[in-house]
A protein has these predicted regions:
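Conserved catalytic core of nucleotide-sugar-dependent glycosyltransferases
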Residues: 102-168
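Short, polar loop motifs at secondary-structure junctions
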Residues: 40-48, 100-102, 179-180, 214-215
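GT-A fold catalytic core of metal-dependent nucleotide-sugar glycosyltransferases
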Residues: 47, 54-57, 73-127
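N-terminal anchoring/stem segment of glycosyltransferases
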Residues: 1-65, 82-85, 137, 257, ...
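Short, well-ordered beta-strand micro-motif
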Residues: 79, 134-136, 210
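Catalytic core and acceptor-binding pocket of nucleotide-sugar-dependent glycosyltransferases
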Residues: 141-271
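Short N-terminal binding/cap micro-motifs at the start of the first secondary-structure element
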Residues: 16-22, 124, 217-220
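A short, glycine-/small-residue-rich helix N-cap motif at loop->alpha-helix starts
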Residues: 62-73, 160
């Protein structure tokens, strides 16, 4: 049997992430992949990216991206071809944390499979999460054509690009084994009110921890939900909730969104 070609891809546009995130991602991959691998970043800014990363221009797109919660610019990766890579590729979000060996993500299932993480926030829907997913280059091209025909209509129907992939990938999708990928907000942070007393835990069998929406790894490391909140004590956070929005639901939502610092992130999310 031929050796599996280990190809990582990621995508970067705008100013939210950039070279620091790309470089950390490469370093985490290098520490957790056995043998040779490549990492290709499709980006609009190569400045500061370490030389081991193969930088390619963003795949061309003539689509006006819809107004939606979904990260629809990822659809650029559904093109029939991608510069510099072919065959199965493992896509990684720039803001995830790799905490264990990645080798299994390259040979799990069949080379032609589309494999996603499970989204634990909607357990009855069986929704996939594209924070870490594998697909053969070109297999999702039919989805790109459907999306191109009516971008806003598709976004209105599915909201998230990962729901569109889950429901429409040719041949269907598979999921990674549950223990491999953990969702920080729902599977690491203790439930309210214990999150005020217990720091987020790293499950022993987790290989990757994903950070959809908020918080981001650097904020979770410091113990805050978003940068604008600053570093608050328990008491300061509670008082902010009490003095905040008048609507009870918004106050309670703010009250629940509290984190203690998460030091294990620094152990893994580094160059």
């Amino acid at each position: 049997m031929a050796a599996v070609k280990k190809q990582i891809i990621c995508i970067n546009w705008g100013t939210k992430y950039g070279a620091p995130y790309i470089n950390r991602l490469y370093a985490m991959c290098a520490r957790n992949i056995t043998g040779a691998f490549t990492m290709t970043c499709f980006t609009d800014n190569r400045e500061g990216v370490r030389p081991e990363v193969i930088c390619q221009d963003l795949p061309p797109s003539d689509i006006v991206m819809p107004k939606s919660k979904g990260i629809w610019p990822k659809s650029r990766l559904w093109n029939e071809t991608l510069d510099g890579v072919e065959g199965p590729v493992l896509f990684l979000d720039l803001d995830l944390v790799i905490t264990g060996n990645l080798d299994g993500f390259f040979d799990y299932g069949d080379p032609d499979d589309v494999i996603l993480a499970r989204n634990p926030t909607t357990p009855f829907e069986k929704l996939g999460q594209t924070s870490i997913f594998r697909f053969p280059v070109g297999k999702l091209a039919p989805l790109l054509e459907i999306f191109r025909a009516d971008p806003q209509g598709i976004a209105d129907e599915y909201t998230f690009e990962q729901r569109f992939v889950t429901r429409n990938a040719p041949g269907g999708i598979k999921f990674w084994p549950k223990p491999w990928v953990r969702h920080f907000r729902t599977q690491c942070v203790p439930l309210f009110p214990m999150n005020y007393f217990i720091a987020p835990k790293l499950p022993a069998d987790a290989r990757v921890v994903i950070f959809p929406a908020t918080p981001n790894p650097p904020d979770a490391l410091r113990g805050r939900w978003v940068p604008e909140e600053g570093d608050r004590t328990r008491g300061e956070h509670i008082m902010r909730a009490i003095r905040g929005p008048r609507h009870f639901d918004k106050r309670f939502r703010h009250l629940r969104r509290f984190l203690l610092p998460t030091p294990w992130i620094a152990d893994h999310w580094r160059e």
